[in-house]
Structures are given as structure tokens and as C-alpha cells.
């Protein structure tokens, strides 16, 4: 009869040996990645040596915290046309801010830069913003009718109703003596507008406290996704998911998805009513969500549930957050330039009177107000950059070239502040957009350009005009001298300390 003798010493030796091997393996992997990172970085710097690059940290790159926009302006003045921007790790991209360079890139069909946009996917999925190739073309063609002018015309009244709800709330505040942080109010208003116009929502999210959960989730995801792009270690899902930022991002995504799922479910329920279904079918042009739902009904293979939600998540974000940024910065620009604000107000009063009725035709009769809106979007573009991953080499007019596989980033912020094309670029000067003025076709791109320009740009411009016109009829906008906004780079242009304005009632 044999006996098995348990030996604690042998057991501990075994455990010790396992950890030794695990440590050696981990050390090898770390060294391997370090060598790989070093070689990749050196190759990129050599390959792109014709483009200037400011000194940067070997790991964190141009780690500028909230000073990235100020640094871009320095690069624009120091380096003609383009330069290198080192992000974290071996992530180096070519930053373009010359219209001739930008025109070349936007005239091609390169895909979105996967190394950047992949981090948007857990939030907004693969909708128009992230899709490439044939599927992007199919979705773009399917959704374009949602922005036909026959669809956009009746939206003007809906936009006006949403703006007036916001202004009614402002009327009840003592905004003259107590400055108001306007971005959150404007964000709820633009969400209200997109919900009613694109998603057939009944009611007002501005009067629903639960809607603030969604706008807060979008704000968090805006920051968290941007920070992830700037952290070399966060590109690995396993590390990011275990981090505090990763957990916060997961929670915010859940809130955002619950909101969009609720919107889809509500509209599906409405269309189960035969009367509502026939009413929708008789429309000459369907709205955004109905296009998706009818496409899903007619051919379940053409559009999956994941595709549908991705498009809803994408437009829900782009249709309210970018517009909220634009409106907030326009208000600030007008507040700090009272002479232009008053001229806009007089123009609006001559067209709208007391503002009880705003129509599509009215929006085309505001030339000076439109000039001011465009100039504010030049100074404060809601989307500060777009990136492409080159599918083939590209050569620019001056002979410099970028090889295949490199990320080319169009700095819209840098482009709009390029002194070679915009003299005194920091000065608010609406005359730049006077009818008799001209500028390079690719020097002004608040809605990007080329085949992948913003599908909802006319929708957005209409909303900007309605918001500015109705606000100027009811309030004089004054800056808060104690809290001057500091623009910072995020997925959408934000202010580090909010946008605070004093509101003086006019009636």
C-alpha cells in the first residue's frame, strides 16, 4: 500500500517557479513592446523627416493637457502648411492646416483613421461617422433624403419652439446679476430639437429631468474618449476596461444606449398603430429614424439592429453636441462684440418683428447675422479636426509626400486660424464673409468637406440661425469679465471653465 506525502516545501517551490517564469515572460513582453515601439517611432520620424516636429517626450509625445489649441496656433505660425504631432507611444500623425494640402486629402477616398475612431465605437457604433467603403456609401445614400429641403422646412418651427422653451426658462432667472453657464442649457435645447425633428419625439426633453442623465453621459464620453486617445496604455482594451476611466466610460455608454434604445422602441411602438403607420407611409420624405425603421421592415438583411442603433447613436450625438458647442460659442462671440450683436438684432427685428413666427424663408433674409455666425464658427469650430488613414501615398503641391498607412489629420482649428489665409485670425471680423468677399475653397470647413462632409450641415445652420435670432430678440448678451472661457480640445470644442454670460432682458 502506497502513501502520497504532501510536501509544503515542494508545493511552495512549484508556486515560486511559476511566478519566476511568469515574471520572465512578462519582462520579455515588455522589452519586446518597448523595442517595437522604439523602432516604429524611429521609422515614422525618418519617413516623415520632411515635416518639422517640435521636441516631444519619448513616451507621452506632445502632452499638452489643455493647451493643445494654443500649441497648434504656434505651430501654424512657425511651420508652413503642416507639421508632425506626436501623441502617446508611437502614435505620430501629420497635422495639416494649409487649404491646398487639405484639398488634396479631402479629394481622395481614404478611410477614417482606425487608430483614432475605433475608440468611438463602444459608444456610437459603426454608423456614418465610423463606416468606410461600400457600407458607408449605402448608408449615406439611404439617409441623405432625411435632409432634403422639403423635410427641413417644417423643422424651422420645431426649432423655434425648442429655443423658446429655453428662453422662457432664462426669463425666470436673474441672469443679469448672476451669470449663467449656458452650455448645459443649450445642450438640452439642441437635444430637444433633434429628438423632435429626427426621431418623431412628442413632448420636450428640456422639461424632463431624466434627459440630463443623457447629456451628462455625452459630456463624460466626450472627455473620456478624448483622454483615451492621448494615453498610450489605454489603447489596449484589457488595460482600459480595468481602469477607472474605462469603468466610467462603460457606465456612460450604458446610459447613452438606454436613451437611444428608448427612442427606437417608442417609435416602433407608434408605428404598430395602423393609422400612424399609414400617415408615415404617405409622407413624401421620411424623417431620419423612420427611414431606418422602414428600411429594416422592408429588408431585414440590409440593415441590422446594430446598424440601426449605431446610426441613431451617431446622429443623436452629432446632432446635438456639436450644435450646442456652435451656438454657445456664437453667443459668446456676440456678447464680446456688442456692436455686431446690436446690428444682428436690428436685422432680425426688421424681419421677424416680435419673433412670434419664424419660417424657412426668413432664414435666408439675415445676411449680416449669417456673416456673424460664420465668423464665430471660424474662430470656434465645433469639430476641431478630422483624420484619414492614407490608403495610398499622397504628394502635395510643394513636393512633400506622405506614405501609405500614415494618419493625416486636418486641423480645422489650425486651418481657421492660419494667418496666411485669414489676416489677424484672432480678430472677430464678420466682413470676411460678406457677399463680395472671397477665400480659398478649403480655408473654411466648419462642417468638414469632400464626400464625407457633415450630412446635417443645413439642418445645423438652420438651427444656429433660429437660436441666434430668437435669443437676440429677447436678451442682450453680456460677457462675464470674471470668467473668460478657455477653449480646449475635446471631441467637440469645449471651454475649460464653461461659457458664462449675463442675460439682460429686453422685454
Curated annotation (Swiss-Prot):
Main localization of the protein described in the UniProt heading: endoplasmic reticulum
Record-listed Phosphoserine modification sites: 437
Secretion signal span: none
One Pfam entry name: p450
Domain of life: Eukaryota
Topology in the lipid bilayer: Peripheral membrane protein
Protein's GO biological process: fatty acid metabolic process
Expression sites (tissue/organ): Gender- and strain-specific expression in kidney (at protein level). Predominantly expressed in females, the expression among strains decreasing in the following order: FVB/N > NMRI > Balb/c > 129 Sv/J > C57BL/6. Expressed at very low level in liver, kidney and spleen of both male and female C57BL/6 X CBA hybrid mice.
Maturation-removed propeptide residues: 1-4
Pathway annotation: Lipid metabolism; fatty acid metabolism
GO molecular function terms attached to this record: heme binding; iron ion binding; monooxygenase activity; oxidoreductase activity, acting on paired donors, with incorporation or reduction of molecular oxygen
The keyword Metal-binding is assigned to this record: yes
Binding site for heme: 318, 454
GO CC terms, sorted: endoplasmic reticulum membrane
Induction annotation: By peroxisome proliferator methylclofenapate; 1000-fold in liver, 10-fold in kidney.
UniProtKB keywords: Endoplasmic reticulum, Heme, Iron, Membrane, Metal-binding, Microsome, Monooxygenase, NADP, Oxidoreductase, Phosphoprotein
Catalytic activity: dodecanoate + reduced [NADPH--hemoprotein reductase] + O2 = 12-hydroxydodecanoate + oxidized [NADPH--hemoprotein reductase] + H2O + H(+); dodecanoate + reduced [NADPH--hemoprotein reductase] + O2 = 11-hydroxydodecanoate + oxidized [NADPH--hemoprotein reductase] + H2O + H(+); (5Z,8Z,11Z,14Z)-eicosatetraenoate + reduced [NADPH--hemoprotein reductase] + O2 = 11,12-epoxy-(5Z,8Z,14Z)-eicosatrienoate + oxidized [NADPH--hemoprotein reductase] + H2O + H(+)
Annotated disulfide bonds: none
Essential cofactor(s): heme
Similarity comment text for this entry: Belongs to the cytochrome P450 family.
Protein name: Cytochrome P450 4A14
Organism: Mus musculus (Mouse)
Amino acid at each position: 500500500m502506497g502513501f502520497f506525502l504532501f510536501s509544503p516545501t515542494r508545493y511552495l517551490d512549484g508556486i515560486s517557479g511559476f511566478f519566476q517564469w511568469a515574471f520572465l515572460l512578462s519582462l520579455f513582453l515588455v522589452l519586446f513592446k518597448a523595442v517595437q515601439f522604439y523602432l516604429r517611432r524611429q521609422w515614422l520620424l525618418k519617413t516623415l523627416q520632411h515635416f518639422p516636429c517640435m521636441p516631444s517626450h519619448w513616451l507621452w509625445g506632445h502632452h499638452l493637457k489643455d493647451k493643445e489649441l494654443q500649441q497648434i496656433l504656434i505651430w501654424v505660425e512657425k511651420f508652413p502648411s503642416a507639421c508632425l504631432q506626436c501623441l502617446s507611444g508611437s502614435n505620430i500623425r501629420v497635422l495639416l492646416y494649409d487649404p491646398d494640402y487639405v484639398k488634396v486629402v479631402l479629394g481622395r477616398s481614404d478611410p477614417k483613421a482606425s487608430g483614432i475612431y475605433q475608440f468611438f465605437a463602444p459608444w456610437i457604433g459603426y454608423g456614418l461617422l465610423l463606416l468606410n467603403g461600400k457600407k458607408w456609401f449605402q448608408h449615406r445614400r439611404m439617409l441623405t433624403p432625411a435632409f432634403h429641403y422639403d423635410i427641413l422646412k417644417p423643422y424651422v418651427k420645431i426649432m423655434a419652439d425648442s429655443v423658446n422653451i429655453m428662453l422662457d426658462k432664462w426669463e425666470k432667472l436673474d441672469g443679469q446679476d448672476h451669470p449663467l453657464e449656458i452650455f448645459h442649457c443649450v445642450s438640452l435645447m439642441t437635444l430637444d430639437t433633434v429628438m423632435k425633428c429626427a426621431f418623431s419625439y412628442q413632448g420636450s426633453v428640456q422639461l424632463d429631468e431624466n434627459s440630463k442623465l443623457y447629456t451628462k453621459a455625452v459630456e463624460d464620453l466626450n472627455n473620456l474618449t478624448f483622454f483615451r486617445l492621448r494615453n498610450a496604455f489605454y489603447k489596449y482594451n484589457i488595460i482600459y476596461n480595468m481602469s477607472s476611466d474605462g469603468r466610467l466610460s462603460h457606465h456612460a455608454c450604458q446610459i447613452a444606449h438606454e436613451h437611444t434604445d428608448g427612442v427606437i422602441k417608442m417609435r416602433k411602438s407608434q408605428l404598430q398603430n395602423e393609422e400612424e403607420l399609414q400617415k408615415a407611409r404617405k409622407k413624401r420624405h421620411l424623417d431620419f429614424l423612420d427611414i431606418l425603421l422602414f428600411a429594416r421592415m422592408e429588408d431585414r438583411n440590409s440593415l441590422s439592429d446594430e446598424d440601426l442603433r449605431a446610426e441613431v447613436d451617431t446622429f443623436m450625438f452629432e446632432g446635438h453636441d456639436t450644435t450646442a458647442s456652435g451656438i454657445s460659442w456664437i453667443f459668446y462671440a456676440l456678447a464680446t462684440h456688442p456692436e455686431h450683436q446690436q446690428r444682428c438684432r436690428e436685422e432680425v427685428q426688421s424681419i421677424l418683428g416680435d419673433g412670434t413666427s419664424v419660417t424657412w424663408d426668413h432664414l435666408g433674409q439675415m445676411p449680416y447675422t449669417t456673416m456673424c455666425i460664420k465668423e464665430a464658427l471660424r474662430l470656434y469650430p465645433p469639430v476641431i479636426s478630422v483624420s484619414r488613414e492614407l490608403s495610398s501615398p499622397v504628394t502635395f503641391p510643394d513636393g512633400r509626400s506622405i506614405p501609405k498607412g500614415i494618419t493625416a489629420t486636418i486641423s480645422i482649428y489650425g486651418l481657421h486660424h492660419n494667418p496666411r489665409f485669414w489676416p489677424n485670425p484672432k480678430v472677430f471680423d464678420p466682413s470676411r464673409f460678406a457677399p463680395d468677399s472671397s477665400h480659398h475653397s478649403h480655408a473654411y470647413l466648419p462642417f468638414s468637406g469632400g464626400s464625407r462632409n457633415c450630412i446635417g450641415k443645413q439642418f445645423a445652420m438652420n438651427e444656429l440661425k433660429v437660436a441666434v435670432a430668437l435669443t437676440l430678440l429677447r436678451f442682450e448678451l453680456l460677457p462675464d469679465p470674471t470668467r473668460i472661457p478657455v477653449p480646449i480640445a475635446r471631441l467637440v470644442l469645449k471651454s475649460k471653465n464653461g461659457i458664462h454670460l449675463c442675460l439682460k432682458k429686453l422685454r
